[in-house]
Amino acid sequence: MTTFYNCNFFDGATEHNTENAWFTVDDHTGRITARGTGTPTSADQQVDFHGQYVMPGFFNVHTHITAGPDTPDGSYGHTEAESAVFATQNMHQLLQSGVTYIRQCGTEYDVDIALKRMQQDGKLPHTPHMMTSGKAFSMTGGHGDSSHGGHAVDSPGEMRKAVRTAFKNGAESIKVMATGGVMTPNDFMEDPQLSVAEMHVAVEESHHKRRIVAAHAEGNPGIQNAIDAGVDSIEHGFYVNEQEAHQMVAQGTYLTPTLIAEWAAAKDGIGVLPAWEIKKAEDALDDTYVNLSRAFQIGVKFTCGTDAGTPFNGFDQTPHEFEMLTKIGMTPAQAYQCSSINSANLLGVADDYGTLEVGKFADFQVLKADPVADVHAVVQADKQVYLGGHREF
């Protein structure tokens, strides 16, 4: 047993810190066995945090670990071996930034599935927990149609077979493309792509296996199509309207806004990215905060995801997403709960991960400043990061 003490403790389940706190972790299981305030219980080892701030590790439920944020096209076109090396490096960077759990949303060559097997065999240290997706699903010629990064399907029957094959190969979740995207030259965010019937088949097959479906859906009518198909999360959702927000609340559909992705492309892409791509990102920014603020007020549950790997959107940027979430009306604590509560619930792992409660895994980060008082505190570069009570960085 190891007891960590003399800290300000934000468990992610409430909206406040607990002062002069301690918590004990079973060194073998990695789970929290007890917590309290004042004088800590006896333990084999004790770690004094000297009044620093402890909070849960972050979820990032929208990552592309095989992509390269330092290239205009996301580095697509690399070999499978190169993709695996880059993915491993990117996972290290995610963990170092405080991200302890990720969900992939489309992966070249199904590299994430191979890396997950290595994780389970203990051969991939210093990487966050991962829910795999394998390749994404798009229509022929649509957003995400890539020789090594996507399944092109053009009917419900093709979708059914492709999803079943993906699960056979080891995918743990499914990503479908409901609309065009910022990075695709031949379409627009308002272009509908996969049909309701096609996406519904993906949902049906996934839910049979207690798996979840994420839909890339930036504009309309694609957002509405994805909601009607019953997907579990809308990714991006820049143009979500009032009617859709109410339907999402009724159905329990989550929204992953990936705010930093469009901000980074519009801010840092000038002179590097094509003009059409910059314009798409800038156009979305004009409306995004109004639309998402309304959705939040209506009661849509937001998750934390950044689209990491897209241009200028690095794997160390997750902490910056929380500042952007506060701009749509959240307090810092509510922004963090998009990660600690909502993201864990979306992925179906909230019994074990997310908040720092007794019985759950001790995946946490240690900060010098109070994250509840100042959302910028989580950007700290030299933070301590723990998985299962063991220090990783």
Feature locations, PLM:
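Histidine-rich, glycine-flanked metal-binding segment
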Residues: T2-T3, F9-M55
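Metal-associated gating/positioning segment near the N- to mid-region
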Residues: Q52-M118, K123, A197, A229
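Active-site environment of divalent metal-dependent phosphoester hydrolases
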Residues: T66-P69, C105-V111, S138-M139, G180-T184, ...
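Divalent metal-dependent hydrolysis catalytic cores, especially in the metallo-beta-lactamase
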Residues: F86-D112, T127-A136, A171-T184, I212, ...
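Histidine/acidic residue-rich metal-binding segments in metalloenzymes
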Residues: A114, G157-L255, G271-V272, K279-F302, ...
